[in-house]
């Protein structure tokens, strides 16, 4: 979800939206490799994205988001919120696999199609399948 959250935040900021990126970790993109995370955070900060670390969403109403600090349970109230975009709870898209399984003898499934996860895992999946063929 780190990749998705950073990408959506950047897209919205480029389109002129005011963006506040809340993350449960210490920084946005915490699990992304350091060289990418730092570069991407620089882009986001340069576009005016406000990054709010160590929080989780616990409620919302018409124009307010209610966050809770994951490290001390402090509550934060974020006003003037038009839209909340969640980058969590991903589900694999196996539609293509299902179509191919009836047409091909062997179908290898990798990446997010196999299970929602990071890009490095998808590359490793591809390497393993490629080496086994």
What is each model feature region?
Residues 2-11, 15, 27-33, 95, ...:
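A conserved FAD-binding loop/helix module that cradles the flavin
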Residues 14-99, 103:
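A Rossmann-like FAD-binding core segment of flavoenzymes
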């Amino acid at each position: 979800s780190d990749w998705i959250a950073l990408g959506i935040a950047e897209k919205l900021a480029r389109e002129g939206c005011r963006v506040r990126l809340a993350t449960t970790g210490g920084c946005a993109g915490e699990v992304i490799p350091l060289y990418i995370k730092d570069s991407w955070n620089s882009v986001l900060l340069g576009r005016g994205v406000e990054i709010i670390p160590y929080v989780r969403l616990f409620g919302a109403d018409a124009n307010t988001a209610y966050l809770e600090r994951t490290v001390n349970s402090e509550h934060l109230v974020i006003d003037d919120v038009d839209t909340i975009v969640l980058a969590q709870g991903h589900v694999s898209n196996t539609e293509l696999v299902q179509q191919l399984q009836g047409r091909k003898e062997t179908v290898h499934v990798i990446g997010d199609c196999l299970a929602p996860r990071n890009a490095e895992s998808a590359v490793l999946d591809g390497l393993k399948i490629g080496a086994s063929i």
